[in-house]
Structures are given as C-alpha cells and as structure tokens.
C-alpha cells in the first residue's frame, strides 16, 4: 500500500503540466542517492512527491484519501530522525571544542534543520489543501487545481533544495569543527604526554644508580636463598629415596614369608590327595580284575 500511495503523490504533479508553462527541471542532488542517511531519506520524500505528479486523473480518488498525507508524514519523520542521528554522532566528536563555538554551531544547525522540516511540512499541507479543494471544487476545474498545485510544488521543491543544501553546508562546518577540535585535543594530549615522558626519563636517570645497586643486592640474596633451598631439597630427596628402599626390602621379605607359608599349607594337602587318588586307582583296578571271568578252553 505504501508503494501504491507513493506512486499516487508523483503522477498528480506531472499531470498538472497541462495548462501551465513547464519550468526548467531542477536536477536532483547526487548526495540524495549516495549521501548520508538523512540525505537519502530526503530523496525518498521528494521521490514520493514526484511520483504523485505522474498520476493520471483515473487515480485522483485514491489521492483524495488521507493515506498520501500519512505516507508523507512517515517520510518526513524518517528524514528528521536521520538528521538528528547524524547531528548526535557529530556532537560526540565536538567534546574537545570550545563551548561557545559548539553552542553557536549547534544553534545554526538547529535553525537549518527547522527550515527543512518546515519545507516538508508545507509540501504535505499543500497536498492536503489540494485534496480539500478537489472535494469542494470551488468553481474551478480539476485541471486548474492540478496546474496550481504543480506550480506551488515546483516552488516548494526549489526552496527545499536550497534549504537542504544549506543544511549540508552547516553539517559540513559542524563536522569540520569536530575534526579540528579533536585534532586540538589530540595535540594537547600528545604535548602533555611528551612532557610526562621527558620528566620520567630525567627522574629515571637520577634514580637509576641506587636502583641498580639495590637490584644487585637483591639478586645476590636471591641466589643465596635459591642455593640453600636447592641443598635442602637434595637432602630431602636422598632421605626419601632411603625410606623407599627400606619399604621395598620389607615388602619383598613379607612376600617371601607369605609364599613360604602358603607352600607349607598346600604341599601336605596335595600329597595326601595324590596318595588317596593312587589308592582309589588300585582299588578300581582290583575290582575290575576280580569281575572278569577266566577264559574257557574248547575240547
């Protein structure tokens, strides 16, 4: 619907050229197509108005609705929001600038911003007035109303271009002031840091000798302490090794004693089982031999 309404405000103004002498076409600024967000938003606003000028009589009833005014209001708000956002971005860079200069630039920029907003407001009001006149007609033909609207819009467009260019220039001054203020701030910081570095260098040169002596004394003490700790660690390590060796010997002795004890327990048992097994085999063999009949001889 927004696209349809956008097509609505640009055809009407083009159709207004029937009975009036066409005025030279004002070229669209290049920045409206590839500039700051607010410039792009302003370009969309006027593209919408130009689109309305291209509408034919068949869509006039669509133009009479309030949708066109609402669409223009949204485009106006988008443009002014983008201007405010860009201005706020520049204000962040104006911190190092003098307060009086900053206040003056801000005041001039607000005035230019207000003029541009008033221009867009007048375009919207002119379309609303045209809608009311079309409804009442007031003894005039539709072509006369369209021609008069086209003339007013061309004048408003020229004024808007002039005020937009003025706003661009003031924003550029605002930005240049921010850059200069930032550069002055950086220069002051650089000078201050240079002074501090020089003072630190002189102070370090004056105190370097005592510090070197203290560092050497601390290094000597630290080396002595490290030697002492290393000797203690070696003694402790040797002591631990001896203790581990004693533990190993005790474990081996206990293992041998346990093995001998197990052998003493199981050998008699195994010998007894072997003897019982041999007796059992002899008994089985004897029983088998007794139960086998003697072979008989045939006569």
UniProtKB/Swiss-Prot annotation:
Provenance organism: Tympanoctomys barrerae
InterPro entries: ApoA_E, Apolipoprotein_A1/A4/E
Phosphoserine: residues bearing it: 141
Protein name (database record): Apolipoprotein E
Record has Iron-sulfur as a keyword: no
Keyword set, alphabetical order: Chylomicron, Endosome, Extracellular matrix, Glycoprotein, HDL, Heparin-binding, Lipid transport, Lipid-binding, Oxidation, Phosphoprotein, Repeat, Secreted, Signal, Transport, VLDL
Top-level division of the source organism's lineage: Eukaryota
Pfam families given in the database record: Apolipoprotein
SUPFAM superfamilies membership: Apolipoprotein A-I (SSF58113)
Similarity comment text for this entry: Belongs to the apolipoprotein A1/A4/E family.
Compartment(s) where it occurs, according to its Swiss-Prot or TrEMBL record: Secreted; Secreted, Extracellular space; Secreted, Extracellular space, Extracellular matrix; Extracellular vesicle
Annotated function: APOE is an apolipoprotein, a protein associating with lipid particles, that mainly functions in lipoprotein-mediated lipid transport between organs via the plasma and interstitial fluids. APOE is a core component of plasma lipoproteins and is involved in their production, conversion and clearance. Apolipoproteins are amphipathic molecules that interact both with lipids of the lipoprotein particle core and the aqueous environment of the plasma.
PTM text: APOE exists as multiple glycosylated and sialylated glycoforms within cells and in plasma. The extent of glycosylation and sialylation are tissue and context specific.
GO terms assigned for molecular function: cholesterol transfer activity; heparin binding; phosphatidylcholine-sterol O-acyltransferase activator activity; phospholipid binding
């Amino acid at each position: 619907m927004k696209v349809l309404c956008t097509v609505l405000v640009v055809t009407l103004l083009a159709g207004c050229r029937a009975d009036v002498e066409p005025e030279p076409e004002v070229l669209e600024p290049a920045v409206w197509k590839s500039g700051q967000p607010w410039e792009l938003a302003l370009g969309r606003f006027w593209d919408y108005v130009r689109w309305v000028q291209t509408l034919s009589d068949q869509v006039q009833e669509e133009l009479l609705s309030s949708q066109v005014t609402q669409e223009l209001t949204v485009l106006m708000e988008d443009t002014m929001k983008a201007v405010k956002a860009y201005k706020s971005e520049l204000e962040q860079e104006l911190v190092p600038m003098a307060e009086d200069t900053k206040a003056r630039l801000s005041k001039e920029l607000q005035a230019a911003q207000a003029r541009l907003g008033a221009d867009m407001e007048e375009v919207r009001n002119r379309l609303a007035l045209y809608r009311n006149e079309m409804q009442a007609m007031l003894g005039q033909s539709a072509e006369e109303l369209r021609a008069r609207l086209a003339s007013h819009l061309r004048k408003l467009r020229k004024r808007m271009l002039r005020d937009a260019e003025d706003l661009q220039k003031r924003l550029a001054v605002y930005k240049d002031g921010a850059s200069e203020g930032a550069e002055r701030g950086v220069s002051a910081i650089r000078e201050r840091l240079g002074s501090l570095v020089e003072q630190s260098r002189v102070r370090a040169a004056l105190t370097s000798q005592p510090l070197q002596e203290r560092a050497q004394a601390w290094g000597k003490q630290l080396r002595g302490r490290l030697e002492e700790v290393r000797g203690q660690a070696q003694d402790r390590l040797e002591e631990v090794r001896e203790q581990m060796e004693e533990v190993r010997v005790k474990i081996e002795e206990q293992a041998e004693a346990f093995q001998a004890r197990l052998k003493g327990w199981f050998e008699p048992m195994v010998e007894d089982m072997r003897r019982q097994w041999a007796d059992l085999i002899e008994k089985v063999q004897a029983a088998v031999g007794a139960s086998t009949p003697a072979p008989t001889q045939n006569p």
